[in-house]
Amino acid sequence: MEAFSMAMFFLSLGQGVFSNVVRSRDAVRGNREVAIKIIRNNEIMHKTGLKELEILKRLNDADPEDKFHCLRLYRHFFHKKHLCLAFESLSMNLREVLKKYGKHVGINLMAVRSYTAQLLMALKLMRKCNIVHADIKPDNILVNESKSLLKLCDFGSASLVSENEITPYLVSRFYRYVFCFLHISFIT
């Protein structure tokens, strides 16, 4: 399985409609902990996974020094015909941070400023690469163990601006942008 052992898939981090994410160790990266997104093995999911891979490569290429806060793709491989994407492993998503550390009080203003600046850097990179994420929400924003570093993840719904058509179903219902309702271009 290309430097991964099934015994090394040691923790399920999440399950979704399109994929499962597990924590593992990557022998190719010095036994470093990684998160592996295992795309479901059917034609539609495989095609979507390949599109996500293309977008992640574009973002990585545009940010070789990893300064723009988009989750880093280390590599990809196939396991039992499943496309697998190996990423840097971060601690928890923003929803979990808010629930654990900000329940009933929110998080402090300095953290909000820092997170906002980092998220804006990710948006700046996506704009430079002509990419629309289309699913920005707390679940798709990861935070490191010390809660100082934030990265945007899950580019499974992302597309190039030139390929995009505004529809009411472009993003998750509760996080839908105003332009979706007004049918206004989101790139100006």
How would you name each of these model-derived features?
Residues E2-S12:
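Conserved N-terminal boundary motif of the eukaryotic protein kinase catalytic domain
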Residues F10-G16, V21:
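Protein kinase glycine-rich loop
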Residues N20-R40:
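Glycine-rich ATP phosphate-binding loop
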Residues I38-K67:
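Conserved N-lobe beta3->alphaC-helix segment of eukaryotic protein kinase catalytic domains
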Residues F68, K80-C84, S89-K147:
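Conserved alphaE helix
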Residues R75-H76:
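A short, aromatic-enriched beta-strand patch in the conserved N-lobe beta-sheet
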Residues L142-S172:
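Activation segment/activation loop of eukaryotic-type protein kinase catalytic domains
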Residues C180-T188:
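Conserved end of the kinase activation segment
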